[in-house]
């Protein structure tokens, strides 16, 4: 059974696929969003034990989400090539939602790290810039600016997890799971596109092959016509050049080739006719030579 014969129409798999796109995966994404909110709350409040537990629970949700996406992917692989455009339209919204949720979750920790790095750099550059501001405007003071900067950092940046806390290790595990989930979502988005590109490529090759076969057939037909037309002429030319009875035999020989190329009953009948004419001509030739017995003499003897 070929690969195409194993495919089925989308309408047969649509209920199962929509169960994933409308219910199962959105439920997992909503659960993941709640974990993200709790993680941000516990990390901001430095409740490391609760943060560690939330990391573990979020990791379980991510694993469940990955499992459900793989199951949906198996269904997508069974869809017939004619329905790939509709399939892509069906799974794109949930694919984009999963990609966005994963990116936001990873960005939460990334922004915290980047903000801490920025804070260190700002502290190195803060004193000269504040001195210039005080000189020009006479309003902004160094102490007030430092307090404002620290206040903004505390509001927007999450505190770094101490490395001696279990939450630090559990976050690394969760981060790896989220990255794997991101790759899985990307692969799912490329699945339908790659299948469609493969089908388009095969169609292009088939069309090119059909064109080549058509052109080749036309060329063969032309060549056959030219050859069949040329052979009788060649026979006539050979017969005319050689002359006499031998030249006539040479012409018949070339004509016999043409009859063989014609094929079928016509070729067979023409060949028999040429054979009879050749036999009669041989008898005439042998009868004109006194030293050679004729075919009829041989039969009598």
Curated annotation (Swiss-Prot):
Region entry Necessary and sufficient for localization to autophagosome, spans: 228-274
Annotated coiled-coil segments of the chain: 49-128
Residue ranges that the UniProt entry lists as topological domain Cytoplasmic: 2-227, 275-301
Family the UniProt entry places it in: Belongs to the syntaxin family.
Mod. after translation: Dephosphorylation by PTPN2; regulates exit from the endoplasmic reticulum. Phosphorylated at Tyr-156 probably by ABL1.
Compartments, as annotated in UniProt: Endoplasmic reticulum membrane; Smooth endoplasmic reticulum membrane; Endoplasmic reticulum-Golgi intermediate compartment membrane; Cytoplasmic vesicle, Autophagosome membrane
Residues where Phosphoserine is found: 288
Keywords: Acetylation, Autophagy, Coiled coil, Cytoplasm, Cytoplasmic vesicle, Endoplasmic reticulum, ER-Golgi transport, Lysosome, Membrane, Mitochondrion, Phosphoprotein, Transmembrane, Transmembrane helix, Transport
Motif Endoplasmic reticulum retention signal in this chain: 298-301
Protein task: SNAREs, soluble N-ethylmaleimide-sensitive factor-attachment protein receptors, are essential proteins for fusion of cellular membranes. SNAREs localized on opposing membranes assemble to form a trans-SNARE complex, an extended, parallel four alpha-helical bundle that drives membrane fusion. STX17 is a SNARE of the autophagosome involved in autophagy through the direct control of autophagosome membrane fusion with the lysosome membrane.
GO BP of this protein: autophagosome maturation; autophagosome membrane docking; autophagosome-lysosome fusion; endoplasmic reticulum to Golgi vesicle-mediated transport; endoplasmic reticulum-Golgi intermediate compartment organization; Golgi organization; intracellular protein transport; protein localization to phagophore assembly site
GO CC terms in record: autolysosome membrane; autophagosome; autophagosome membrane; COPII-coated ER to Golgi transport vesicle; cytosol; endoplasmic reticulum membrane; endoplasmic reticulum-Golgi intermediate compartment; endoplasmic reticulum-Golgi intermediate compartment membrane
Quaternary context: Forms a SNARE complex composed of VAMP8, SNAP29 and STX17 involved in fusion of autophagosome with lysosome. May interact with VTI1B. Probably interacts with BET1, SCFD1 and SEC22B. Interacts with PTPN2 and ABL1; involved in STX17 phosphorylation. Interacts with COPB1. Interacts with TMED9 and TMED10; the interaction is direct. Interacts with VAMP7. Interacts with RUBCNL/PACER; promoting targeting of RUBCNL/PACER to autophagosome. Interacts with VAMP8, SNAP29, VPS39 and VPS41; these interactions are increased in the absence of TMEM39A.
Species this protein is from: Mus musculus
Membrane-topology annotation of the record: Multi-pass membrane protein
N6-acetyllysine PTM positions: 41
Name the UniProt record assigns to this protein: Syntaxin-17
One MF term in the entry's GO annotations: SNAP receptor activity
Highest taxon in the source lineage: Eukaryota
Chain positions found as Phosphotyrosine: 156
Keyword Thylakoid tagged: no
Every t-SNARE coiled-coil homology domain range: 161-223
Ranges annotated as spanning the membrane: 228-248, 254-274
N-acetylserine: residues carrying this PTM: 2
Keyword Acetylation assigned: yes
Spans within the Lumenal topological domain: 249-253
């Amino acid at each position: 059974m070929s690969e195409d014969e194993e495919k089925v129409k989308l309408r047969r798999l649509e209920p199962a696929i929509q169960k994933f796109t409308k219910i199962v995966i959105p439920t997992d994404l909503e659960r993941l969003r709640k974990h993200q909110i709790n993680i941000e709350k516990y990390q901001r409040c430095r409740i490391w034990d609760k943060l560690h537990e939330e990391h573990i629970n979020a990791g379980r949700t991510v694993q469940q989400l990955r499992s459900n996406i793989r199951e949906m992917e198996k269904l997508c692989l069974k869809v017939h090539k004619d329905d790939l455009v509709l399939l892509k339209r069906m799974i794109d919204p949930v694919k984009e939602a999963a990609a966005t949720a994963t990116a936001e979750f990873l960005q939460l920790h990334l922004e915290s790290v980047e903000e801490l790095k920025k804070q260190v750099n700002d502290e190195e550059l803060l004193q000269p810039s504040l001195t210039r501001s005080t000189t020009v405007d006479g309003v902004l003071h160094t102490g007030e600016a430092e307090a404002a900067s620290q206040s903004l950092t505390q509001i927007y940046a999450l505190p770094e997890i101490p490395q001696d806390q279990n939450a630090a290790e559990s976050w690394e595990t969760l981060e790896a799971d989220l990255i794997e989930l991101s790759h899985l979502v990307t692969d799912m988005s490329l699945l339908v596109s790659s299948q469609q590109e493969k089908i388009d490529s095969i169609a292009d090759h088939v069309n090119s092959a059909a064109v080549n076969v058509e052109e080749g057939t036309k060329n063969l037909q032309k060549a056959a016509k030219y050859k069949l037309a040329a052979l009788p002429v060649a026979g006539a030319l050979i017969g005319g050049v050689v002359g006499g009875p031998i030249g006539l035999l040479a012409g018949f020989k070339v004509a016999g080739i043409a009859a063989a190329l014609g094929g079928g009953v016509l070729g067979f009948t023409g060949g028999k006719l040429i054979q009879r004419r050749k036999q009669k001509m041989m008898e005439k030739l042998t009868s004109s030579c006194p030293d050679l017995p004729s075919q009829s003499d041989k039969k009598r003897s």
